[in-house]
Amino acid sequence: MRTSKYLLSTLKETPNDAEVVSHQLMLRAGMIRKLASGLYTWLPTGLRVLRKVENIVRQEIDNAGAIETLMPVVQPFELWEETGRSEKMGPELLRFTDRHVRPFVLSPTAEEVITALVRNEVSSYKQLPINLYQIQTKFRDERRPRFGVMRAREFCMMDAYSFDIDKAGLEKSYQAMHDAYCKAFDRMGLEYRPVLADSGAIGGNGSQEFHVLAESGEDLIAFSTESDYAANIEKAEAVAPAVERAAPTQEMTLVDTPNAKTIAELVEQHGISIEKTVKTLFVKASDAIEAPIVALIIRGDHELNEIKAENLAEVATPLEMATEEEMRELIGAGAGSLGPVGLKLPFIVDRSVAVMSDFGAGANIDGKHYFGINWGRDVELGQVADLRNVVEGDPSPCGKGTLMLKRGIEVGHIFQLGNVYSEAMNCGVLDSNGKNVILEMGCYGIGVSRVVAAAIEQNNDKYGIIWPDALAPFQVAIVPMNMHKSERVQEAAEKLYAELTAMGIEVLFDDRKERPGVMFSDMELIGIPHTIVIGDRSMDEGHFEYKNRRSGEKTPVAMADIVEYIKAQLE
């Protein structure tokens, strides 16, 4: 490809609204352009990378035995009503009506559509197992699109769906897709980890996320220091403390704390250790209990894990905090003064709080706290659960080592759905005994467009992108110095371009009438792995200059050897 015939569209300056490195570089390298909030046009350079990710994913998913299909982006709303997800998805599900006032949605995922298809097309166990996938545009009406294509409203995704006669078959299909993901991300040259995850709105019995490790990642991942255990912080279990609760050494006393509205203020003003304080959070209760509010009690230095809270039968989904008005109506006090002593509402205590003694908490009276609280003596302990986020140094749930935390970008997710959707939509087949059996489903997603951004977050420097070879928009750049003033430089560049192109190598030939500095900057910004510089001075010495984008090393290569040298670099 000649730059004179190509839409290069590089930018010198970083746009002000680009927060993360990948967004900045994708705009500057001419990969994408913003059309509206969360909506992007993919320019030729970006599309070349996107297609490479697609092709690697397609090859590995094909190798795992899945079959490609293509489903509509527009889906009938009634399908979503069949599974009950029409409400669970919330406002992210974009709904609209056609001219006949029939309700539809823009597809964020396709469990309902594929289940309806299999329900109609597969009738016998002899047709199983089957795994169908597509690579297609999806739409989620994100409330706050940000970070470019990392969290866009419209995005490209590979979504696959397996159907098996039993759980053993599902586990086999799930493992095959797990292995296919690993092979795909290995080929892309990414540093990634599969981690245990919550199933969220998709549902099902078990799931894993695939995270590209990057400091800009939105997710925190917990890793064991001595095993291969890894989990999203939403899923990582906070192991119950191994110590027994100490015996009381203090009497419970009521203390005036008019200026202590937060744990930090309480600690600073009254000299109590933060590990000896608790936070009492009021959340909306589910229909499983009669009370409108349930209290969740965690240690003062810990954070509530909202996913763990939502998974409690007593807590409404999605998690919703009680308002100040609701707190005052129920107990007569507001946030900052709440606690378990004398509380007339159901409460659930975190494991770490259950072993505390002589601790401080709000007295359910504005501006007052109790110090020296002890379970059993001053208040009954009641229900205990894992409510908090893990922190570095916590024991690993696997029993080996402690936990360390790193940030990651989720690029893939696999689920063992079981019969959540197939049962709701009556998707079954006749087994070998002629009995109708509801199918076991798995679903699998890779954010193809997000992989592009994640790869940049992991591979960049101050000059621009450093693509892994498998993802680069072009494999080789040819930069002829002052080509339009030197006939022999032009002839050498044209000859080399023709030779490399004939070999099937993807080459970007910079034939613009530009200063060499501009040409070098653009090639580094775009991130082409291998650059050949052709100039009069080097030709006088009988060589071209080869530059490796990742290492930055420059190597003189004899003109007669350059083709074989490049072939060796690409192997």
Swiss-Prot record:
The enzyme's E.C. designation: 6.1.1.15
Enzyme class: ligase
Catalytic reactions on record: tRNA(Pro) + L-proline + ATP = L-prolyl-tRNA(Pro) + AMP + diphosphate
Key words of the record: Aminoacyl-tRNA synthetase, ATP-binding, Cytoplasm, Ligase, Nucleotide-binding, Protein biosynthesis
Keyword Lyase on entry: no
One Gene Ontology cellular component annotation held by this UniProt entry: cytosol
Subunit structure, interactors included: Homodimer.
Function statement: Catalyzes the attachment of proline to tRNA(Pro) in a two-step reaction: proline is first activated by ATP to form Pro-AMP and then transferred to the acceptor end of tRNA(Pro). As ProRS can inadvertently accommodate and process non-cognate amino acids such as alanine and cysteine, to avoid such errors it has two additional distinct editing activities against alanine. One activity is designated as 'pretransfer' editing and involves the tRNA(Pro)-independent hydrolysis of activated Ala-AMP.
NCBIfam families registered for this protein in UniProt: PRK09194.1, proS_fam_II
Protein name: Proline--tRNA ligase
Species name: Vibrio vulnificus (strain YJ016)
